[in-house]
Amino acid sequence: MTSKNTICLWFDKDAHEAARFYAATFPNSEVTAVHKAPGDFPGGKAGDVLTVDFTVLGVPCMGLNGGPQFKHSEAFSFQVATDDQEETDRYWNAIVGNGGQESECGWCRDRWGLSWQITPRTLTEALAKGGAEAKRAFDAMMTMKKIDVAQIDAARRG
């Protein structure tokens, strides 16, 4: 990694598999390096994958196979802006359909427990506007799991 700021994500043992999934799912994403452990470590043994360098939508990340001590939580999430329902559906279905879980308000978790916010731009634009339009869009969002772009647009119009 050459970036001065890299997100380090702790995985039990599947960092390489997760990184490959993210690279296949999101544009401007790739696995850039795989580093094997030079010796035994709490999550594995010499020769096992220790870290994986990758990008998600251009954001540099490192996956660390550290063992089961720490779990992902909603305290950290990737927010992915989408342009339309097709893009929203594609990302949501890839994450949830690959062993993930739906949550509320556009949030979901992948099979490794990492949280994602799949957020159509129409929603963030409405919330940024403030006022009655923001309140209507917010109220509509609060009833959803995956965000329905048509319903958000209808709420924006009143």
Per-region residue spans from a language model:
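A charge-rich, low-complexity, intrinsically flexible signal that marks solvent-exposed coils, linkers
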Residues: 41-43, 74-76, 157-158
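Extracellular/periplasmic catalytic domains that process cell-envelope and extracellular macromolecules
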Residues: 1, 44-48, 55-56, 70-72, ...
